[in-house]
């Protein structure tokens, strides 16, 4: 099953695509162009996640509780009340300015028998940077993992579109 969604959120378009979807899992990809150099895009991605991630897609309700740790075994983690935390994804590959690969299940997928691999690829392009986001998720649910493909695809497309707006204008796009 292939589906293509063109998502328009404030500033620009993101091509969001469900590459594969079936009972055992799904793969989604979002591609967009950002009008900034790859080094700047990468730096803002790594260090400013609290400025552009939608707080509605956090457990704490505050995107400033998110952080990306850029060392072996690092993570995309979130601080929770009372010294709590959640480790959304583990960083398994870091090629500064070029590529990040994470392993794990984000958000509500953590409570399911699911895991995934998420890649962020930063490529120099005419006028800036092409950002490809690919998330492959596998697992078991009685009614199939494919029911999660569309919501995950839409959530990721929203986040990277907000990121694009943040890099280009200094403010994340709102819905």
Model-derived features: positions:
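Beta-strand/loop substructures that line and gate deep hydrophobic ligand-binding cavities in soluble
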Residues: 27, 107-154
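Hydrophobic pocket/interface hotspot
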Residues: 41-42, 76, 91, 102, ...
């Amino acid at each position: 099953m292939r589906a293509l969604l063109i998502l328009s959120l404030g500033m620009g378009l993101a091509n969001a695509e469900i590459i594969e979807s079936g009972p055992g899992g799904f793969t989604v990809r979002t591609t967009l162009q950002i009008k900034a150099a790859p080094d700047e895009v990468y730096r803002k991605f790594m260090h400013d996640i609290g400025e552009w991630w939608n707080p509605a897609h956090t457990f704490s309700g505050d995107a400033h509780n998110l952080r990306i740790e850029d060392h072996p075994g690092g993570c995309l983690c979130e601080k929770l009340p009372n010294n709590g935390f959640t480790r959304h994804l583990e960083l398994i590959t870091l090629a500064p300015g070029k590529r990040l690969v994470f392993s794990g299940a984000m958000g509500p997928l953590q409570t399911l028998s699911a895991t995934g691999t998420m890649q962020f690829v930063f490529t120099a392009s005419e006028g800036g940077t092409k950002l490809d986001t690919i998330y492959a998720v596998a697992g078991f649910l009685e009614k199939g993992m494919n029911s999660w493909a569309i919501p995950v695809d839409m959530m990721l497309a929203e986040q990277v579109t907000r990121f694009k707006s943040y890099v280009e204008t200094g403010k994340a796009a709102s819905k």
